[in-house]
UniProtKB/Swiss-Prot annotation:
Protein known as: D-glycero-beta-D-manno-heptose-1,7-bisphosphate 7-phosphatase
Species of the source: Haemophilus ducreyi (strain 35000HP / ATCC 700724)
GO cellular component annotations of the record: cytoplasm
Cellular localization per UniProt: Cytoplasm
Gene: gmhB
Site (Contributes to substrate recognition) location in chain: R108
Active site: D9 (nucleophile), D11 (proton donor)
Length: 182
């Protein structure tokens, strides 16, 4: 039997979305997120980041800059909360992007490629898992991958009627998910 997981969008879910966040100085965790992640991890859930990063394809920042920020974020969660991300998956592509990143891929949400790869790599049972994101695309990707519970949070993009309809739960923040998860 596979493991249970919480799939996590980054911008607008874990951190305040200032638009194409790629520098440590601009990265701010949403209040209470670190503690909530620790509680989810303590309940036996794998924590898996699944994030579109089209800023790479658009030339706003490099893949190396993204990786440096991600390493810092990962280190901060471990150092401050004892949280270890079990998987980090990102899509650097964008159909109107530049160079090698200009492509229509299977990993960019709303496609489910990142989820499918994580499910395979980490032996995740999507039927026991959650997706937490701030956009309809997050939920559509999760649904395609068979993730049971789709959670929309109000900490990022404005919630659309379509997104609200697709969500199993609409919460103010990732912090509010903890009581729903056993």
């Amino acid at each position: 039997m596979g493991k249970k997981a919480v799939f996590l969008d980054r911008d607008g879910t874990l951190n305040i979305d200032h638009g194409y966040v790629h520098q440590i100085d601009d990265f701010q965790f949403i209040e209470g997120v670190g503690k909530a992640l620790k509680q989810l991890q303590d309940k036996g859930y794998l924590l898996v980041l699944v994030t579109n990063q089209s800023g790479i394809a658009r030339g706003y920042f490099s893949e190396q800059q993204f990786q440096q920020l991600t390493e810092w974020m990962d280190w901060s969660l471990d150092e401050d909360y004892g949280v270890v991300l079990d998987g980090i998956y990102y899509c650097p592509h964008y159909p109107e992007g530049q160079g090698e990143y200009q492509q229509k891929c299977d990993c960019r949400k709303p496609k489910a490629g990142m989820f499918q790869q994580a499910i395979k790599d980490l032996n995740i049972d999507p039927a026991q898992s959650y997706m937490v994101g701030d956009k309809l695309e997050d939920l559509l990707a999760a649904e395609t991958a068979g993730v049971k519970t789709k959670v929309l949070v109000r900490t990022g993009k404005a919630i659309t009627a379509e997104g609200e309809k697709k969500a199993d739960l609409v919460l103010n923040s990732l912090v509010d998910l903890v009581p729903y998860v056993n």
